[in-house]
Amino acid sequence: MGKMIYMDHAATTAVRPEVLDAMLPYFTEKYGNPSGVYTFASKNKDVINVARDIIADSLGAKPEEIYFTGGGSESDNWALKSVVEAFQDKGKHIITTSIEHHAILHTCRYLEKLGFDMTYLSLIHI
């Protein structure tokens, strides 16, 4: 059998060794909740803020424009709901595809219940 080729990087991706090295202490020793009020936690909040500053600087953004989420579904929901909120005075019609990630489709179904008109494009129309 030949070498395995992993083709599902949209779902998960291997962590680079240098990233693992940097994160390992926070998985094993420094795992305090950064939102906690105790010292163990506040140190982690400081580390997160340093990371936020580095990312913002590399993107030419402000640190307060950088948000961290728990994963793809949370990010999808947040992005879609944020766009809806930002453009609520422009109308209530959203166009998406029928093959979107379930996190997007579930949020679209929720928005339909709130009175939004949805158009789901099929692959045939794309």
Q: Residue locations for each model-derived region?
A:
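Pyridoxal 5′-phosphate
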Residues: 1-124
